[in-house]
Amino acid sequence: MTDEFFNHLHERLLYEGLCDVGFSRIDETVPPDLARYHYAVTLVYRLSDAVVDEIDLSPTYAYFQHYRAANALLDRCALITCEMLRREGAAAYPIAASQSVHDRGDKYTGIYQHKSAAVAAGLGWIGKSALFVSTEHGPRVRLATVLTDAELPCGAKPMESRCGDCNLCVKACPSGAILGKNYVRGMERSEIFDAEKCSRHMKQAFGHIGRGAVCGLCMKVCPVGRSR
């Protein structure tokens, strides 16, 4: 595939509403049943500051709807990406923006971890909250991923955590699920974040907001990517 194709893909996805697109090689993180795919396209959508900034002691109805709408847009962009790659003769496999699977030993994980590809693409790092933190937009983003066997233009190096001594997300978490440790590549998520505790609290405290609980407090307080 040519540079012209990848430039066109990038421009098309930005036109569709994404804020960033990344390319990475994912041999170290792809699960065995998807090992035929050596590359990933990361799709990034920036959430509305106006909506996120309204989050205070709990998520809002507006944030719940915005979260779902962002996921729908990302899923649409993943399908567009797949079709554009298919027309070039490549195989492509879309990973939904938000879909948990229960057959991989962890009911709070997806088919493939979006943030693994995003970090490999050099777009940001994994924060103490276990959220992906974009260098430009902070954690105020949603992600989707397209796996492919097409050779993508990769050159960025994975980023290490830049959270340092900041513990704002740790203090903001109402469930105590964020353990306050900087993520280092190779760590299990459970070493920095208790997904079960987070999910349980969301369902109990915020389940009235809508089907499929959300929170967003840790994302809201992160200083990275805040609008000025």
What are these regions (language model features)?
Residues 1-76:
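Non-catalytic, usually N-terminal nucleic-acid engagement modules in DNA/RNA processing proteins
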Residues 70-228:
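Catalytic cores of enzyme domains
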